[in-house]
């Protein structure tokens, strides 16, 4: 509370005229008045809060040097300070012998008194520090809040006390000008031309001075020291009224200091000097009270009473209404009606006689101005000469005499005389002068006698035989007053008596009181009572004496009185925090010594036992309960009182409550204390919240929560033998109550409550319970509690000495398997009992937002002591696994900081069985999760085996984690594990091909789920295989989220992986959990892959119109769970009708029900369309984990794009991507890619196009996507590419642009951009932006595949869209969508072929993850559609893993795909066709290629039945393509693919955009690895096709760089880095390309540096950087990977993508790179650079495209960020699971309404800008 600052400005020039005695009396009274003011403030606010000061000034003379005040600052209220003041006051008044007034004439130039007063006030305001705390007193609190506005000053007295806490007070002690004449004298205005009234106000108190007072928050009062003369009656009160008006502006008043109540007669002989001044006439306390109280309070204390005043004038009786206000609030109120009758005038009245009588004084005022003026005029005439008047006051039937005196022109004072006066001989003098002389003599005695008679009657009625009236003040008070040197009047006594206890009673008085009670009276009730009274009196007397003698009244003396011990002395030197801790520790020790019994009683008994403890007091009542009902009612009342009574401590109330129950139970043993309390007293946290609801009574709620919490702790204390589960439940309840308190109040309040009330009582008795409560709250254990905890409470794992702030590690390692909570905790205690306690647990940051990078993983390790190493219990959901054999070896659960490159040296067989590591989020509660492999305590002896990567202080005890989880547990299910990270969906983590032992993945393309395979083969397959999601219709390999699996493929058998991951995914999917973009959810968490099954099935089942399906399909195919044991071929066959069934779903812990297609856009539905339905098995055999090809990849072109896969791109919505795009991205790429035939990329592209996924989004998706599907970007038919541009403009991401064609085109289309590897590892779905022309072969609907996406879109717009997009984008983009769909059919086929080719590519070169970007990795139905059969020809495990796989593509069904949207360009097949593509020979060929894992060329194979765009080019020959893939695991760990086309290939197909794009893509990516087929070979063409190249770009950085959990996963390498980027735009490679790790400040891993690097391809592009970034998905922030972990890393655009982006119009880019790619592929000869191809396609399709590309003609150097990477490295990256597929530019395919491509393409959606078609891409051959 702020200090009370009081300053007295004392005018030393004012001295009452008279003798020296008069002056001395004035000084004495002034000192007394000041002291009384200070004491009243001290009584009100505390003596230590009052600071005061004083200043002397001259108002009538020139300022004297002697008036310099010694102290100009505030002083404390101490005796010495006041003594100094007295001395100085005496000096000031005695320095000048004369009265100042006698010297007035000598000073002709003296200033006016007003100026002197104002100057003094200004000096005081400036000298004193009003707004600062007292620095000399540390106990004084803080600064006082200032009032900045004046408005508060205008009514300061209305609602608050005048001397409120935040005010400073300034008193001017001087004579107040009363009349107008005095006012003029005060202002020195003696001339007749006096200034205007306004000027008078300004001179009285200038505005500047008022402002100063307000700024300093000072209230100004004027203490009038003037004395009334007996014969002085002011004519007017202008002066005092003016002054009061001005003071009211600053909240001040004019108060009398010496003014008497009644005028005194100067001639009275008995007057002494004090009485002459009227000192006793007006009690000082009344003045103080008047200042302290507001007007409202004064009216309440002194209520006005209505009365009638009558007088006789000129023989007529006149009357008027008046009000009577009591002078003292203690006097009785008069009974109405009250009549005052003026009787006459009193002469020579001795006023002193009235002061000794019992009187009651009232102030009489007349509210009526006219009547009042007349009445008071009459009174003035009578009072001339200072005579008082006699009046009669009749109240009811009683008539009393009264003395009336006039105070002012409107105020009079009436003093009612008591009847006792006459009997005591104090009758009024007889010399009364009456107005009517005849009546005076006879009337007066009658009046007196009547009054006396009435009073006698009253006294008799009251049985008062004694006529003496009891004095108002007790005898002891009078005795005390007599001890004083001077006499006191009644007024003084009345004011002093009530405050005597504060002002202090002398020792003499206390001794007298003690003597009074020395002999107990017999009237007392008994001896005991008498003794008690004596003891109290004695104690009081001793206390007063000791306090008076021992202290001088100052606070400091009390401090000095405290005992100073060495401990206290030492603690004074400590910091405040240390002092608090030490006090707590000392209190704990004190409690230990006292024992628990001391807390039961509330107080100590006196020595004589007179005072009983609270327990004793309650016992008698407790024993009287006759029934339990009475007890319960009593408990209810007691409980309610405890809630309402907040003065008592909570523990004492709880103990009293329980003591009542205990005493009752002594006689009723059948009732149990616990049961009774549990049943009738305890309340749940929920019930309390419901009870108070929205009530504002937070205090009661908090109080009740405190009672409930302490009650449970008390129960734990009194019943320590309870079952541990019961105790745990109580702990949780207590934590809930405390959380309620924290929410209602704040954490500081809760901490204080725990420290002050809970810890001291229960710290010694139940420290473990308290520690558990703190753990559950997630707060730090107090040091005092840690000190008393048993040594075995903490485990070495959980604590480190001097542990720093808790990281997420304290929560992140959750117990995955617990046989039982009790057993587990007991085992932990027993295990750690032998270990030294190291330190306290710090606050867990999981309660806050701690970085996920600090997450720990629990990695089951084989027990080195136990024999059966083969039995390994994955920490994934145990429900999926079969319970281990009883004798199964126990696994050691070790907290391991995730390190992607940390391998445990275990034999390959063991590794294959090793379950993927599980990152558990401590936030999810797994309270009673049991280990399936642990049956008894012996099984889980968790010895502390630490992995070197995890420092001791980073490890957390399972016990603590369990406590924290149970405390935060909100879900009902016991098992709530989030596998990779709390947020990200399950998806395959990227694996590094360099770790061969971990590379094992099962390719769904090659094996059916039921088909067994050898372990070696599994291992080989895992290294190059796509995500399981692709492989299995119902299962997604993406379920495996371990970094190892993510990087290197599944290590477990497909069956197991499927069970574990699928079940979890299916569970989540079944729960309807929405798909999440893994990259978005948690930077550290690997995104989960969408189930490919769901997508594939959706794709297959749905007509192309339902674009949603593709979303899922894409995601499912694209993602394979990293550690999923099973990547069974069944996944391939995942043509799940229901997208939700995809196995990946089951695997995904995160809810990812919908296939990416669904999420992405309405187009997803058409992806699921029949085309998708028939999933062709994609040979996304590449090591990329994400690329598992769904078994059944739908050949139907319409669905394939989506079905192909939701590449990771989809998973992570691009930042720029539209909401729909984001939706697509959100779909975790990890969702197993549907077996849908469409390659994931195709799906992604489709998805992306409709969704307008930003390249960033795609990137992030790719990163997040765990499945590294190597699907090459499917080159969409040119038509579809065209569609893509439309979709770009359109809101529908997928449907509008032919995602499929783009996908088929491979990375050229924006899909590559999106393909950027997302964290999850899934290649983001690439928008089917690849040149429409390329895909057009597939989508025959688009008129000219060659045309840019925009043109293609425009053309395709005439054709009906596939179907309304879910988001409605489809409607917007219907035209484009329809084109897209038609193209998509073609695209799907192409994509499928492409996907197969891509997969083949991926398989052939697991080195490069180009296919991450490429559609191949997409395991969507489209991808798998084209592969009719695949066989492992040769396997070699010596000197590197080598496999020869022969696969052939089925012709894709172009006819199935139907476009709902109007495709302007589509002239071919009717829209009503089934969604599947026609099985044209070229389509079949492409399908075969897709199955084989490589694209046979541009996926031109079969155009969908929808009409092809004229520019589409030739359809691929019906002949299915057959390829032989040879995969070789190099020593560097990078797989190497060699594709060999074994079956006939239609050379004519090469030009087809899709085929060509696929081929060029494959060739570009894998050129070194691929053995280029004939020009007619689809692979060759596709390799030449620019779109094919982009995937390689996609694989720029190594994922190996960082652990998935940590911030950055770098892509292994950038396969192709164009030397030049579009000028303003980063080269497609530039933005999209992931900057080399070094650019971000991370050193490139050695293994990356050691990889062979491909020289940067020179890309001559012109264009602006912004466009590239925005327009090209990859370049766009697509280039930047969304995943926070990969922050700063840009996805590398595939060469194809670059070409596409450069050559493709912005709008096309927006749609997707793929469309551009497709067109380029068709247009360009096989050997032509992708840019050239693009240019040709653009020329053929649309001149506008070339124009659009023309602006990209300038050369731009590739940003230095990109590092050249060897060809093999690039290839490995693209193929490697480490790389995520670039997301197709899904969102780019927003609706393109016109044939024009819109420049306003969402960055994600836009394909990468390609340089002008004329530019050539200088591509170096990949090096082995």
Curated annotation (Swiss-Prot):
Gene knockout outcome: Embryonic lethality, due to impaired S-phase progression and disruption of the S/M checkpoint, leading to premature mitotic entry and mitotic catastrophe.
Main location: nucleus
GO cellular component, one term: nucleus
GO annotation terms (biological process): DNA repair; DNA replication; mitotic DNA replication checkpoint signaling; mitotic G2 DNA damage checkpoint signaling; regulation of DNA-templated DNA replication initiation; response to ionizing radiation
Region (Disordered): 542-572, 590-622, 907-973, 1001-1035, 1098-1117, 1189-1221, 1293-1388, 1459-1518, 1617-1650, 1803-1824
rRNA-binding found in the keyword field: no
Biased composition, class Low complexity, residue ranges: 546-555, 1347-1370
Residue ranges with Basic residues bias: 1807-1824
Biased composition (Basic and acidic residues): 605-619, 932-952, 1480-1490
Classification via Pfam families: Treslin_M, Treslin_N, Treslin_STD
UniProt keyword annotations, A-Z: Cell cycle, DNA damage, DNA repair, Nucleus
Record localization: Nucleus
Molecular function terms, GO-annotated: chromatin binding
InterPro entries (UniProt xref): Treslin, Treslin_M, Treslin_N, Treslin_STD
Composition-biased stretches (Polar residues): 562-572, 907-921, 1005-1014, 1103-1114, 1319-1345, 1462-1472, 1617-1629, 1636-1650
Role summary: Regulator of DNA replication and S/M and G2/M checkpoints. Regulates the triggering of DNA replication initiation via its interaction with topbp1 by participating in cdk2-mediated loading of cdc45l onto replication origins. Required for the transition from pre-replication complex (pre-RC) to pre-initiation complex (pre-IC). Required to prevent mitotic entry after treatment with ionizing radiation.
Subunit structure, interactors included: Interacts with topbp1 (via BRCT domains); interaction takes place in a cdk2-dependent manner. Component of the replisome complex.
Family the UniProt entry places it in: Belongs to the treslin family.
Name of this protein: Treslin
Lineage start: Eukaryota, Metazoa, Chordata, Craniata, Vertebrata
Gene that encodes it: ticrr
């Amino acid at each position: 509370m702020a200090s009370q600052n009081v300053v007295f400005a004392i005018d030393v020039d004012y001295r009452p005229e008279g003798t020296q005695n008069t002056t001395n009396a004035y000084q004495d009274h002034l000192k007394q008045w000041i002291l009384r003011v200070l004491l009243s403030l001290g009584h009100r606010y505390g003596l230590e809060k009052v600071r005061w000061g004083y200043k002397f000034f001259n108002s009538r003379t020139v300022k004297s040097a002697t008036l310099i005040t010694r102290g100009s600052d505030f002083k404390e209220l101490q005796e010495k300070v006041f003594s100094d003041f007295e001395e100085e006051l005496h000096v000031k008044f005695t320095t000048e012998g004369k009265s100042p007034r006698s010297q007035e004439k000598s000073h002709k130039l003296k200033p006016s008194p007003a100026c002197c007063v104002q100057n003094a006030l200004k000096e005081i305001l400036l000298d004193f520090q009003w707004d600062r705390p007292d620095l000399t007193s540390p106990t004084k609190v803080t600064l006082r809040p200032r009032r900045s506005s004046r408005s508060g000053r205008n009514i300061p007295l209305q609602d608050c006390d005048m001397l409120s806490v935040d005010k400073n007070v300034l008193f001017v002690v001087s004579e107040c000008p009363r009349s107008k004449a005095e006012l003029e004298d005060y202002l020195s205005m003696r001339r007749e031309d006096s200034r205007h009234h306004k000027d008078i106000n300004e001179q009285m108190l200038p505005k500047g001075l008022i402002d100063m007072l307000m700024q300093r928050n000072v209230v100004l009062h004027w203490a009038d020291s003037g004395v009334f003369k007996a014969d002085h009656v002011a004519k007017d009160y202008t002066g005092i009224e003016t002054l009061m008006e001005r003071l009211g502006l600053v909240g001040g008043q004019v108060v009398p200091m010496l003014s008497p109540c009644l005028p005194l007669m100067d001639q009275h002989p008995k007057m002494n000097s004090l009485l002459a001044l009227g000192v006793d006439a007006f009690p000082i306390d009344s003045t103080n009270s008047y200042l302290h109280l507001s007007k409202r309070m004064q009216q309440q204390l002194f209520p006005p009473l209505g009365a009638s005043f009558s007088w006789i004038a000129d023989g007529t009786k006149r009357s008027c209404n008046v009000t009577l206000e009591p002078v003292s609030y203690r006097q009785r109120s008069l009974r109405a009606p009250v009549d005052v009758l003026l009787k006459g005038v009193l002469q020579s009245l001795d006023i002193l006689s009235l002061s000794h009588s019992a009187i009651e004084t009232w102030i009489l005022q007349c509210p009526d101005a006219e009547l009042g003026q007349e009445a008071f005029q009459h009174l003035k005439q009578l009072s001339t000469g200072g005579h008082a008047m006699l009046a009669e006051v009749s109240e009811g039937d009683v008539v009393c005499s009264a003395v009336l005196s006039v105070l002012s022109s409107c105020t009079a004072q009436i003093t009612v005389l008591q009847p006792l006066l006459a009997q005591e001989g104090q009758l009024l003098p007889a010399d009364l002068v009456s107005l009517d002389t005849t009546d005076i003599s006879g009337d007066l005695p009658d009046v007196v006698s009547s009054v006396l008679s009435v009073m006698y009657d009253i006294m008799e009625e009251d049985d008062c035989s004694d006529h003496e009236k009891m004095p108002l003040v007790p005898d002891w008070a009078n005795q005390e007053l007599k001890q004083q040197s001077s006499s006191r009047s009644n007024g003084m006594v009345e004011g002093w008596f009530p405050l005597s206890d504060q002002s202090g009673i002398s020792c003499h008085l206390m001794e007298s009181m003690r003597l009074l009670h020395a002999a107990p009276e017999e009237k007392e009730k008994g001896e005991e009572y008498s003794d008690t009274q004596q003891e109290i009196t004695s104690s009081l007397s001793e206390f007063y004496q000791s306090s008076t003698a021992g202290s001088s009244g100052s606070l400091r003396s009390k401090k000095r009185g405290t005992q100073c011990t060495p401990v206290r002395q030492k603690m004074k030197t400590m910091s405040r925090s240390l002092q608090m801790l030490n006090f707590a520790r000392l209190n704990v020790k004190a409690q230990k010594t006292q024992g628990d019994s001391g807390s039961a009683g509330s107080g100590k008994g006196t020595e004589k036992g007179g005072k009983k403890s609270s327990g004793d007091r309650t016992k008698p009542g407790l024993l009287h309960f006759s029934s339990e009902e009475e007890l319960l009612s009593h408990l209810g009342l007691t409980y309610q009182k405890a809630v309402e009574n907040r003065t008592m401590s909570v523990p004492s109330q709880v103990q009293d409550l329980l003591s009542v129950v205990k005493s009752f139970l002594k006689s009723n043993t059948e009732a149990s204390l616990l049961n009774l309390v549990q049943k009738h007293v305890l309340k749940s946290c929920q019930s309390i919240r419901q009870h108070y609801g929205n009530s504002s009574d937070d205090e009661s709620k908090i109080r009740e929560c405190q009672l409930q919490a302490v009650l449970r702790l008390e129960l734990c204390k009194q019943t320590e033998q309870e079952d541990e589960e019961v105790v745990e439940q109580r702990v949780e309840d207590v934590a809930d109550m405390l959380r309620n308190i924290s929410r209602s109040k704040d954490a500081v309040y809760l901490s204080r409550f725990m420290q002050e009330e809970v810890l001291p009582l229960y710290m010694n008795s139940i420290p473990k319970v308290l520690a558990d409560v703190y753990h559950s709250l997630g707060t730090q254990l107090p040091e005092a509690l840690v000190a008393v905890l048993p040594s075995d409470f903490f485990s070495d794992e959980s604590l480190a000495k001097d542990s720093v702030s808790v990281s997420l590690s304290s929560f992140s390692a959750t117990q995955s398997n617990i046989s039982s909570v009790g057993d587990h905790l007991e085992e932990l205690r027993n295990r750690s009992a032998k270990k030294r306690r190291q330190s306290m647990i710090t606050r867990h940051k999981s309660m806050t937002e701690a970085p996920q990078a600090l997450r720990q993983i629990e990695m089951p390790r084989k027990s080195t002591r136990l024999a059966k190493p083969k039995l390994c219990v994955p920490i994934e959901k145990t429900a999926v696994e079969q319970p281990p054999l009883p004798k199964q070896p126990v696994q050691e659960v070790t907290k391991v900081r995730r390190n992607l490159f940390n391998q445990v040296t275990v034999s390959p067989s063991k590794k294959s069985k090793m379950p993927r590591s599980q990152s558990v989020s401590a936030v999810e509660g797994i309270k009673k999760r049991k280990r399936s492999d642990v049956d008894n305590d012996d099984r889980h002896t968790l010895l502390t085996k630490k992995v070197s990567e995890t420092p001791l202080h980073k490890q957390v005890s399972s016990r603590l984690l369990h406590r924290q989880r149970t405390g935060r547990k909100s879900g009902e299910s016991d098992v709530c594990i989030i596998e990779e990270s709390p947020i990200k969906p399950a998806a395959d983590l990227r694996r590094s091909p360099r770790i061969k032992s971990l590379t094992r993945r099962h390719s769904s393309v090659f094996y059916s789920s039921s088909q067994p395979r050898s372990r070696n083969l599994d291992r080989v397959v895992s290294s190059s295989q796509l995500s399981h999601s692709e492989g299995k219709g119902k299962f997604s390999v993406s379920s495996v989220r371990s970094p190892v699996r993510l990087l290197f493929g599944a290590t477990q058998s497909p069956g197991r992986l499927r069970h574990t991951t699928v079940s979890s995914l299916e569970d989540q999917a079944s729960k309807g959990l929405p798909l999440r973009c893994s990259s978005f959810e948690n930077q550290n968490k690997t995104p989960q892959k969408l189930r490919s099954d769901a997508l594939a099935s959706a794709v297959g089942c749905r007509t192309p119109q339902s674009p949603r399906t593709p979303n899922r399909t894409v995601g499912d195919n694209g993602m394979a769970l990293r550690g999923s044991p099973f990547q069974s071929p069944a996944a391939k066959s995942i043509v799940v009708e229901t997208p939700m069934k995809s196995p990946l779903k089951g695997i995904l812990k995160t809810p990812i029900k919908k296939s990416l297609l669904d999420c992405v856009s309405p187009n997803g539905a058409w992806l699921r369309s029949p085309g998708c339905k028939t999933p062709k098995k994609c040979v996304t055999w590449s090591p990329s984990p994400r690329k598992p090809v769904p078994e059944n990849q739908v050949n139907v072109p319409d669905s394939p794009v989506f079905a192909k896969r939701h590449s990771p791109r989809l998973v992570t919505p691009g930042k720029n991507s539209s909401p729909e795009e984001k939706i697509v991205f959100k779909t975790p790429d990890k969702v197993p890619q549907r077996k849908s035939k469409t390659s994931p990329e195709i799906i992604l592209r489709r998805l992306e196009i409709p969704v307008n996924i930003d390249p960033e989004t795609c990137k992030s998706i790719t990163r997040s996507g765990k499945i590294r599907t190597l699907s090459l970007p499917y080159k969409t038919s040119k038509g579809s590419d065209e569609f893509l541009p439309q979709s770009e403009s359109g809101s529908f991401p997928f449907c509008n642009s032919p995602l499929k064609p783009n996908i088929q085109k491979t990375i050229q289309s924006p899909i590559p951009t999106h393909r950027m590897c997302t964290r999850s590892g899934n290649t983001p779905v690439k928008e089917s932006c690849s040149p429409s022309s390329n895909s057009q072969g597939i989508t025959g609907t688009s008129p000219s595949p060659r045309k840019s996406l925009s043109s293609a879109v425009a053309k395709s717009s005439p054709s009906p869209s596939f179907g309304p997009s879910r988001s409605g984008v489809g409607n917007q983009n219907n035209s484009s969508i329809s084109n897209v769909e038609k193209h998509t059919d073609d695209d799907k086929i192409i994509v499928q072929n492409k996907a197969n080719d891509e997969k083949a590519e991926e398989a052939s070169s697991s080195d490069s993850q180009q296919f991450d970007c490429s559609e191949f990795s997409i395991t969507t139905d489209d991808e798998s559609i084209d592969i009719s059969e695949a066989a492992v020809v040769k396997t070699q495990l010596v000197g590197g893993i080598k496999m020869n796989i022969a696969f052939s593509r089925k012709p894709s069904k172009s006819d199935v795909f139907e476009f709902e949207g109007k495709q302007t360009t589509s002239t071919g097949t009717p829209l009503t066709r089934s969604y599947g593509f026609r099985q044209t020979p070229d389509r079949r060929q492409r399908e075969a290629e897709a199955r084989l894992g490589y694209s046979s060329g541009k996926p031109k194979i079969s155009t969908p039945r929808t009409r092809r765009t004229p520019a589409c080019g030739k359809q691929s020959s019906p002949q299915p393509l057959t390829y032989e893939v040879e995969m070789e695991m190099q020593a560097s760990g990078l797989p190497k693919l060699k594709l060999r086309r074994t079956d006939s290939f239609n050379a004519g197909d090469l030009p087809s955009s899709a085929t060509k794009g696929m081929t060029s893509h494959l060739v570009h990516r894998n050129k070194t690895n691929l053995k280029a087929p004939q020009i007619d070979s689809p692979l060759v063409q596709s390799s030449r096709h620019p779109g094919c190249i982009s995937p390689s770009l996609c694989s720029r950085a190594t994922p190996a760089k960082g652990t998935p959990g940590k911030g950055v996963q770098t892509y292994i390498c950038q396969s192709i880095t164009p030397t030049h980027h579009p000028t303003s735009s980063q080269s497609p490679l530039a933005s999209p390309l992931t900057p080399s790790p070094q650019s971000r400040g991370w050193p490139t891993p050695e293994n990356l540096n050691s990889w062979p690097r491909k020289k940067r391809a020179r890309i001559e592009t012109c264009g602006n950087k912004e466009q590239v970034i925005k327009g090209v998905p990859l370049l766009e922030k697509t280039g930047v990977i969304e995943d926070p972990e990969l922050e700063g890393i840009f996805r590398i655009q595939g060469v194809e993508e670059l070409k596409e982006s450069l050559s493709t119009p912005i709008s096309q880019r927006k749609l997707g790179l793929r469309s551009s790619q497709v067109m380029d592929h068709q247009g360009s000869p096989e050997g032509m650079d992708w840019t050239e191809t693009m240019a040709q396609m653009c020329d053929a399709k649309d001149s506008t495209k070339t124009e659009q590309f023309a602006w990209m003609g300038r050369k731009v150097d590739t940003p230095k960020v990109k590092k050249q990477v060897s060809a093999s490295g690039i290839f490995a990256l693209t193929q490697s699971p480490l790389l995520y597929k670039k997301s197709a530019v899904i969102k780019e395919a927003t609706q393109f309404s016109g044939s024009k491509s819109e420049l306003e393409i969402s960055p994600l959606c836009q394909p990468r800008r390609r340089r002008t078609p004329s530019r050539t891409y200088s591509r170096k051959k990949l090096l082995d």
